Swiss-Prot record:
A motif (Di-lysine motif) lies at residues 266-269. This is Surfeit locus protein 4. InterPro entries: Surf1/Surf4 (IPR045214), Surf4 (IPR002995). The di-lysine motif confers endoplasmic reticulum localization for type I membrane proteins.
Length: 269
């Protein structure tokens, strides 16, 4: 009974949090979600020559193609961020940002680095949720018009987004025998499964937001490293990519799990 009371209290807190923040939570979620693209686009501007030289050296593609790659990254990411934040042509912005992820995955050889590949896939999951949200906003203009129960593409995008988001947490698991690591892995894995299958989704996603934010601030504190050290850029990249996944989880909290989830199926039972 005590355990049920604790779970009930936690769910009440999550519902209360959502009621208080429902006006601005989607805005915060979108800002967090695009933060890695915004930071990377700005970095392309300030590190133009370094990025160009890296691409030229890695792919031997020449000055012109390397410069075009950097320009495409800069323009594509900053334009996509502006469109998402202004809620204009959000679907096109998402497709453009998907393209940037794919381009960077190949150009920076992320395809062969499992950890970074999983984080890029998690970032793609956040964009899928943003795409689903934009479809919801588009359909809301036709409120009252008879439609099917729910758009299948939208609910499957939400499912795919949830599943991809949890890949981020698989990169945080620690495979050692310490008591703290074992507890952290058990709790983290349980929360990941809950989000993926859509059970107690808002509470599980909100808990993961708090946990991931704490880990991010502790392990990726780039502001404590001098700017001239390579570790500064590495931690900054990691920090903002993690913030983007947090943004995706906040979208799950704000929008719910969608039609393909245990929470929705419970309503039919």
């Amino acid at each position: 009974m005590g355990q049920n009371d604790l779970m009930g209290t936690a769910e009440d807190f999550a519902d209360q949090f959502l009621r208080v923040t429902k006006q601005y939570l989607p805005h915060v979620a979108r800002l967090c979600l695009i933060s890695t693209f915004l930071e990377d686009g700005i970095r392309m501007w300030f590190q133009w020559s370094e990025q160009r030289d890296y691409i030229d050296t890695t792919w031997s593609c020449g000055y012109l193609l390397a410069s075009s790659f950097v320009f495409l990254n800069l323009l594509g990411q900053l334009t996509g961020c502006v469109l998402v934040l202004s809620r204009n042509f959000v679907q096109y912005a998402c497709f453009g940002l998907f393209g940037i992820i794919a381009l960077q995955t190949i150009a920076y050889s992320i395809l062969w680095d499992l950890k970074f590949l999983m984080r890029n896939l998690a970032l793609g999951g956040g964009l899928l949720l943003l795409l689903a949200e934009s479809r919801s906003e588009g359909k809301s203009m036709f409120a009252g018009v008879p439609t099917m129960r729910e758009s299948s593409p939208k609910q499957y995008m939400q499912l795919g987004g949830r599943v991809l988001l949890v890949l981020m947490f698989m990169t945080l698991l620690h495979f050692d025998a310490s008591f703290f690591s074992i507890i952290q892995n058990i709790v983290g894995t349980a929360l990941m499964i809950l989000v993926a299958i859509g059970f107690k989704t808002k509470l599980a996603a909100l808990t993961l937001v708090v946990w991931l934010f704490a880990i991010n601030v502790y392990f990726n504190a780039f502001w404590t490293i001098p700017v001239y050290k390579p570790m500064h850029d590495f931690l900054k990249y990691d920090f903002f990519q993690t913030m983007s996944v947090i943004g995706g989880l906040l979208l799950v909290v704000a929008l719910g799990p969608g039609g393909v989830s245990m929470d929705e199926k419970k309503k039919e039972w």
